Regions:
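Extreme N-terminal leader/anchor segments
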Residues: 2, 10-13, 17-85, 130-136, ...
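Non-membrane alpha-helical segments in proteins
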Residues: 123-137, 149-153, 189-197
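Structural helix-adjacent loops and short alpha-helical linkers that scaffold large soluble proteins
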Residues: 135-148, 198-219, 259-277, 314-330, ...
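Solvent-exposed loop and edge beta-strand segments that line ligand/cofactor-binding
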Residues: 112-125, 136, 172-189, 234-249, ...
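Long, well-ordered core segments of solenoidal/helical folds
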Residues: 89-100, 147-165, 212-237, 271-291, ...
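Active-site lining segments of carbohydrate-active enzymes
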Residues: 174-296, 309, 410-416
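Carbohydrate-active enzyme catalytic cores, enriched for enzymes
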Residues: 304-475, 647-649, 659
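CBM-like, beta-strand-rich accessory domains located in the C-terminal region of large
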Residues: 165-168, 189, 382-396, 482-673
Length: 673
């Protein structure tokens, strides 16, 4: 299916957007949850009187980024983290900085490759982050120079925007960036904030040994970030002409932090803050009351998580005047990833999300927010990732996040805790169920099932799909995110196997793929209980029934019902039992398929299939109401490095062939000890 240019610009899975011809693009005042909490105090006039009346240095002090002159703070930075960073920084020195060549930038348009250029830019950023951290701790000229070199390298980079995001090709047909009209994307905001934090920390030493560098940083930030932010209403992620996603808080938070640290005009900072809050309110307004993020946990860190970090910055800049900790949706959103935790580094993943933690999540900020809101389960969830002898943060999270973690002594001293692992979660806004037999334990099975729509951010065609974990480890899986290319956010997105409904554990009436867009939905017939709503009593079976006929291009009135039942009390054999029952009534006879996607060793034996990985095993049986159904097995030999990192060398699709205008099919999953 190919979207029209107009539909593509408004799609939740388009790469970036230039407003369709005739679209009204204007900034009109917005009133959402933030305005409901703060009222006119978040508007420019009030902020001009509060923030604008402070000195620029007072505002900088409030955001808690310590200068290199704060030797007491840097002497107390986590030694384990600094030791790791120093070792990597020593390896950096003496080698050339990565080349972000024009030919690499042009590959996005020429052959669809975006990863090679992105790796070069990321390498530059991470090397600079390491250099700044080591310079701050050691106060040695060698490292101050290394950091200055990195700052100059980024200042001389033609663009801070990525080729997959830059609008120069859409506007002017360029394969290179338009340096006259720079685009403000995620990475432009990241680099501006990174340079601003570096300037805040090392500025006193750069004044002595690198005069002119700080002025260069300010010039580039002005040209590439502040001026576009203040003058361009067509930037789609501002929310003035289309819906927003994780780009909104991610960019806004970085722009705001950079403005506070680099601008000497407090009144201008107040104006930027007012514009940023008006835009952020549009993002907060799209968050559902249950706190669910339709992009999943992987994007929570760089979406809702960025919102939390920005709100922390807002509270700091306003000296506590604008405090978001009491806004209900903020608290529910904070709890979302904790509710999706399967155990260890495994999570319920949807859309373009990974099933496993990548190992460099910035755990300090949910720990801090759990403390700010008094939510002990959130702090416990964060502490579950705080392993003895391991760094408090990773450079991959960026310099601002690294510095906040390094100087947070409460996070440094936090002791590992057991993850809360809620027993029952039901998020009606995205129709996601998570169920296990007992809270706080990975023992036994866990079920996650999903309804929703095929118009979600970073959408996969996954309506009616489910995953099963044993001992916290996914065995029936959601494939998740492969490496991004130009195809990923184009009209050809659903040619990618991982995003097709046929490669989710979902049915395929007549062998069909699910449809694309808001018209294709699942309907909840019977909803389970689970937090943040009422929770079923311990031992009571969970039941979710979905109507999936609307997920497929079927004749009106055709029905495909799927019912999920989780029985934590155990089957007759003494094991927990998950039952997935399909019933259909269609207008015509035909052949249908039911798919299961498995990770690990898949062993068929008669009408039983066993799946095993990392010492955990499940058995799968299926029948059509008359006799057992034996699946055929299709092996996907993975060649994508991101998928291999999660699943190993292969995935296996179990294909059950069924048929009839009317019929039923039941799948049973049990744990094997």
């Amino acid at each position: 299916m190919t979207r029209s240019p107009e539909a593509d610009a408004l799609s939740r899975v388009s790469a970036h957007a230039v407003p369709p011809r005739g679209t009204a693009v204007r900034h009109a005042e917005f009133r959402g949850p933030l305005f409901a909490e703060w009222g006119s105090e978040m508007r420019e006039e009030a902020l001009g009187a509060t923030v604008g009346s402070a000195t620029a240095e007072t505002l900088r002090e409030r955001v808690r980024i310590p200068s290199i002159d704060r030797r007491d703070v840097w002497a107390d930075a986590d030694p384990i983290t600094i030791e790791r960073i120093t070792a990597a920084a020593e390896a950096d020195r003496g080698r050339p900085w990565a080349d972000a060549l024009g030919s690499l930038f042009a590959r996005y348009v020429r052959d669809g490759d975006r990863a090679t250029y992105e790796r070069a830019v990321s390498d530059r950023q991470e090397r600079l982050t390491r250099a700044v951290a080591v310079a701050a701790v050691t106060d040695q000229q060698t490292w101050i120079d290394e950091a200055a070199d990195g700052a100059v390298v980024l200042c001389e980079q033609s663009t801070w925007s990525l080729p997959a995001h830059d609008d120069a090709h859409a506007r002017r047909g360029f394969v290179l960036p338009d340096v006259i009209s720079p685009y403000l994307d995620l990475v432009a905001g990241e680099i501006a904030a990174q340079l601003a934090v570096a300037d805040r920390i090392l500025g006193p030493r750069w004044d002595e040994s690198w005069p002119g560098l700080r002025e260069r940083i300010r010039h580039e930030a002005e040209t590439r970030v502040f001026t576009p932010f203040e003058t361009r209403d067509d930037l789609w992620w501002l929310g003035y002409w289309r819906e927003v996603n994780n780009w909104n808080p991610w960019i806004l938070g970085n722009v705001l932090l950079a403005a506070v640290l680099l601008l000497d005009d407090a009144e201008r900072v107040a104006r930027i803050l007012a514009r940023a809050l008006d835009s952020l309110d549009r993002y907060v307004a799209e968050l559902p009351g249950d706190g669910a993020i339709d992009e999943g946990v992987a994007y929570w860190w760089n979406g809702a998580g960025r919102m939390l970090e920005m709100l922390d910055t807002v509270a700091a800049i306003t000296d506590g005047g604008l405090d978001a900790t009491r806004i209900p949706v903020v608290g529910e959103t904070l709890r979302f990833p904790m509710r999706m935790h399967l155990g260890g580094d495994w999570y319920v993943n949807v859309a373009d999300g990974w099933a496993r933690s990548r190992g460099h999540e910035p755990w300090q900020f949910p720990f801090r927010w759990g403390s700010l809101t008094g939510d002990g389960r959130v702090t416990e969830w964060a502490r579950a990732a705080r392993r003895p002898g391991q760094p408090v943060a990773d450079v991959a999270g960026g310099l601002p996040r690294l510095v906040r973690a390094l100087v947070d002594t409460a996070w440094r001293d936090a002791v590992a805790a057991a993850a809360p692992l809620p027993a029952a979660v039901w998020l009606p806004s995205v129709q996601v169920l998570v169920r296990r037999s007992a809270a706080g334990s990975v023992a036994g099975l866990a079920l996650a099932a999903k309804g929703g729509t095929n118009d979600e951010n970073h959408n996969h065609k996954d309506l009616g799909s489910f995953l099963v974990a044993a001992g916290g480890r996914q065995l029936l899986v959601d494939v998740g995110k492969p490496t991004y290319t130009a195809q990923t956010f184009s009209a050809e997105r659903y040619r990618i196997r991982a995003m097709q409904s046929g490669w989710h554990s979902a049915p395929a009436p007549y062998g069909l793929e699910q449809g694309e867009g808001p018209a294709f939905t699942a309907q909840v017939i019977t909803a389970p209980q689970g937090e943040p709503g009422p929770v079923s009593p311990a031992g009571e079976a969970a039941l979710l029934e979905l109507e999936l006929g609307g997920a497929y291009p079927l004749v009106a009135g055709d029905s495909w019902r799927r019912t999920f039942r989780f029985d934590g009390s155990g089957s007759a054999g003494g094991t927990e039992r998950i039952e997935v029952a399909d019933r259909w009534r269609l207008s015509e006879d035909g052949a249908h398929r039911v798919h299961l996607i498995a990770a690990g060793e898949v062993t068929p034996s008669g009408d039983v299939v066993e799946v095993a990985a990392d010492g955990h095993r499940i058995r799968i049986t299926a029948d059509d109401g008359n006799a057992p159904v034996v699946p055929s097995l299709e092996v996907w030999e993975l060649d994508d490095p991101e998928l291999i990192a999660v699943w190993g060398p292969r995935l296996t699709r179990l294909v059950y062939d069924v048929g009839g205008r009317v019929g039923s099919f039941t799948t049973v999953i049990e744990e094997l000890s």
